Regions:
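Small-residue-enriched hydrophobic alpha-helices in membranes
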Residues: 1-74, 84-185
Length: 185
């Protein structure tokens, strides 16, 4: 728990440092504005990558693996579709993610593909299935936060958070019992 508290303090310090740069705290106001600036979000994504890396040895459970793959698929399909190049790009990010290297690549690929296929066949049904998988990580707060951070790293990889990506991340926070404000959503 001490590791998470230290990392959370680092995130708060970063948030406070960004407060003067026009990103109005993260909750409320101008809905899309904080997501398009890049600078503050890019630093936050970098911090999340660092935090996830420092927790690598703790993030080895099947619940984290499955919830993370559901989260990645949900972020990829947030706009209701996933084309082949986007699917390949997200899959490459998953397979190169330091923390996710705790798991066999074929397991990750299989779980990610299952969720993407469900989401593209019937978005609402696939989303419900993905959220059920994500909610299973709520039992362990460190894993729950790591699932959201993993989703944010995937969503922020292109330097921009779409409204749809931010929305599914907020919904995942609710499924995990976490405050979206903790992640500047």
């Amino acid at each position: 728990m001490a590791v998470w508290d230290r990392l959370k303090d680092q995130a708060k310090a970063l948030q406070q440092g960004q407060a003067g740069h026009g990103a109005s705290g993260g909750h409320g106001g101008g809905h899309g504005a904080p997501r398009s600036g890049g600078g503050g979000k890019a630093q936050l994504i970098g911090l999340f990558k660092t935090q996830l890396g420092s927790l690598k040895n703790e993030l080895k459970s099947g619940a984290y693996r499955d919830a993370s793959m559901a989260m990645c698929a949900l972020v990829a399909a947030a706009d209701g579709q996933v084309d082949a190049s986007e699917r390949q790009q997200v899959e490459s990010m998953i397979l190169s993610n330091d923390v996710l290297q705790n798991f066999p690549p074929e397991q990750l690929r299989q779980r990610f593909s299952k969720h993407v296929d469900q989401l593209t066949a019937n978005f609402q049904h696939g989303k419900a299935e993905a959220m059920q998988e994500i909610a299973k990580a709520a039992k362990k707060p460190t894993e729950a936060r790591a699932v959201i951070q993993t989703g944010m790293v995937i969503a922020g990889a292109d330097g921009h958070f779409s409204q749809a990506e931010a929305q599914v991340l907020r919904e995942a926070c609710a499924a995990l019992g976490l405050s979206p404000a903790e992640f500047q959503l």
